[in-house]
Curated annotation (Swiss-Prot):
One MF annotation (Gene Ontology) recorded for this entry: structural constituent of ribosome
Gene Ontology biological process terms in this record: translation
Alphabetic keyword roster: Ribonucleoprotein, Ribosomal protein
Region (Disordered): 1-22
HAMAP family referenced in this protein's UniProt entry, alphabetically: Ribosomal_bL28
Protein name (Swiss-Prot/TrEMBL): Large ribosomal subunit protein bL28
Family assignment from sequence similarity: Belongs to the bacterial ribosomal protein bL28 family.
Any one Gene Ontology cellular component term annotated for this protein: cytosolic large ribosomal subunit
Length: 78
């Protein structure tokens, strides 16, 4: 399963670990993803989404119905 947020589209990015001696080694910065169940009142069921913590804040702000309609408009199956 891809490490991608279903709400924001956040995905891993690459960068460097930098030691005190300024040696650079490659690393990946991973998004803070959680699999979370949300209750959808209109459908009378839970929907399981893989969302980042920012995605959860967006759902709290806009509502799960609005966010689900945006995800479905992108063509993603839920």
């Amino acid at each position: 399963m891809a490490k991608v947020c279903q709400v924001t589209g956040k995905r891993p990015v690459t960068g460097h670990n930098v030691s005190h001696a300024k040696n650079h080694t490659k690393r990946r910065f991973l998004p803070n993803l959680h699999t979370h169940r949300f209750w959808v009142e209109s459908e009378k069921r839970f929907v399981k989404l893989r969302v980042s913590s920012k995605g959860m804040r967006i759902i709290d702000k806009n509502g799960i119905e609005t966010v689900l309609s945006d995800i479905r408009a992108r063509g993603e199956k839920i």
